[in-house]
Amino acid sequence: MRTKGFASITGSAILAVVLTAGGLRAQAWSQVGTESDFLLHDFHFADGSVLPVLRLHVTTLGQPRRDALGKVTNAVVVLHGTGGTGRGFLSPTFAGELFGPGELLDSATHFIILPDGIGAGKSSKPSDGMKARFPNYRYSDMVTAQYRLITEGLKVNHLLLVMGTSMGGMQTWMWGERYPAFMDGLLPLASVPGPMAGRNRMMRKLVSDAIRNDPEWQGGNYVTQPRGLFGAEEMLFMMTSSPLQLLKAAPSRDTADAYVTRWMQTHLSSTDANDFLYQFEASGDYDPSPDLEKIVAPLLAINSADDQVNPPELGIDERMMPRVAHGRFVLIPISDRTRGHGTHSLPAIWKGYLGELLGTIERGSGPTP
């Protein structure tokens, strides 16, 4: 249906609730949720380009609750990392630890919002047909679209919590600056509140160069995936893996070779070069550092000490956090449980800190709308 002449939203419930006497079955998480598409017409990007129709896909769990004044009090948005999807969070290791019965963000009492960002999942992306004619979107465009999805599409006027992993963590910082009174709390995971610089930026440039400098890319108009995508995926593997866990998983030369071969085959089979390129280049405008004082909601930033993307020796969070009025930084030590950059998707390790953040919110340290 049309909504105010500029957007439409359609929904199809996949499976609202799957219950047993013991609660939600772990194997059923992949079937849970209501999926919807929100269409934004004539969407203007920061670089001046316009997309006639921008499709934003979202999965939701639970229902919004409103107070006597009509403000939504239980909505939580979870923002995915580069190349991820909202439904990627619906796993036993993530959803089972946070959204299940009795958990901190139980979907029976919370309205969980899991968007697919621009360029990923079932949202509009280059591989839909435009290829390299697709607008060169940036994080600022993604956050703008997320806000419109939540406010115009889902009719949510306030968020209990904004949280995200990796790219989603970076966008969480941006949410806190751009919409400071819109949320009660912020949880950026595996990110830093500084400019896209140093090795992180270099890795992204190497990914971009591997694809753009490959003659098979053909300016984005390839028919088969260019071989440059192979080198780009190799960079991603090295940056996001955990040396400790890789040695445990592959303690010999042969097992190491087999492991990385399987990893590459799996990722190459499901990745489009243009989508991958755009996803990494989207970070080009990221730098929340000038506006950290604008963040007024309680913020808890969590990184792990074995994260090669945001290595702890840089000390960026420690230097920046004093500028955040209600900010706190936690660095999780390396252990048999951590998984490098991927620790962001293992709430069993860090959800105790989330509980502390929610306690702070309940005590009323957040912004007053």
Segments the model singles out, each with a brief description of its role:
Residues 140-160:
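Conserved acidic catalytic loop of the alpha/beta-hydrolase fold
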Residues 295, 301-303:
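Short beta-strand/loop motif that positions the catalytic acidic residue
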Residues 308-314:
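Conserved alpha/beta-hydrolase "acid-adjacent" motif
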